[in-house]
Amino acid sequence: MSAAGDPRLNDFRRALDAVMIDLAQQIVRDGEGAQKFVTIRVSGAASARAARRIGLAIGNSPLVKTALAAGDANWGRIVMAVGKAGEKADRDRLGISVGGVRIAEKGGPVAGYDEAPVARHMAGRDIEIDIDLGIGKGRAEVWTCDLTHRYIDINGSYRS
């Protein structure tokens, strides 16, 4: 390949991206005591940077991670993490979906929300959470895992 516009370079980039994504996801799945792989998609943020910060705040929240371990689609903990991110957010515009099912919007639970399909989704090993801030066009995707009793067992059983 001698030119930056060589189509083979695009093929290589796509293949390299696929390998890097797979490796990154394997690291998350291999977290100490992890049982669930969680994809958090944030949309409607003020910017891509804001969306990423919000996604990381959700993904790194011990309260969210323990709720995930328990199979609890606790939207209040997700809203708390959004607020802690320090980015622009409006509770009355916020929408939250778990496993493709809208569970909260405009500051409260969705009317007529059926928890059964969400509970089935939360019982699985691959969890999807979508947050729509309804403010702008910023988007981001973050991967995380749950936080289980096994994590405590692993990290509480040795000294350095």
Regions from the language model: what does each represent?
Residues 1-160:
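A structural signal for small-residue-enriched, beta-sheet-centric alpha/beta enzyme cores
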